[in-house]
UniProtKB/Swiss-Prot annotation:
GO CC annotation: extracellular region
Disulfide bridges in this chain: none
Residues recorded as bearing Methionine amide in the entry: 91
Propeptide feature ranges: 21-79, 95-116
GO-annotated biological processes: neuropeptide signaling pathway; tachykinin receptor signaling pathway
Signal peptide segment: 1-20
A family per Pfam: Neurokinin_B
Protein name: Tachykinin-3
Primary subcellular site in the record, as a coarse category: secreted
Keyword Signal: yes
InterPro entries documented for this protein: Neurokinin-B/TAC3, Tachy_Neuro_lke_CS
Location in or out of the cell: Secreted
Family matches, as PROSITE patterns: TACHYKININ
Amino acid sequence: MRSAMLFAAVLALSLAWTFGAVCEEPQGQGGRLSKDSDLYQLPPSLLRRLYDSRPVSLEGLLKVLSKASVGPKETSLPQKRDMHDFFVGLMGKRNSQPDTPTDVVEENTPSFGILK
């Protein structure tokens, strides 16, 4: 669930940046603004790759998020199976059938006397 929320936040920020939503500082700090803008220059190859990437539709985003929210419930069974296999590998194979009680012969068992 956290990963889906993080993905949605990153996607929203990247879409806002792609469509030109930019926060601008007041012009009172003009000298500092030019110094900071040099720090955030991206290489042209990265910019070209970002602009050439295909846009994400809202329907596609909703499909991905709905699959992400449904996914962990469906994958819980295989994960449980994997953990079971892991512990069986550590502890050794166990019998799949429950222990069947054997007939106890009274002659071989020690007795402590008759209780009244």
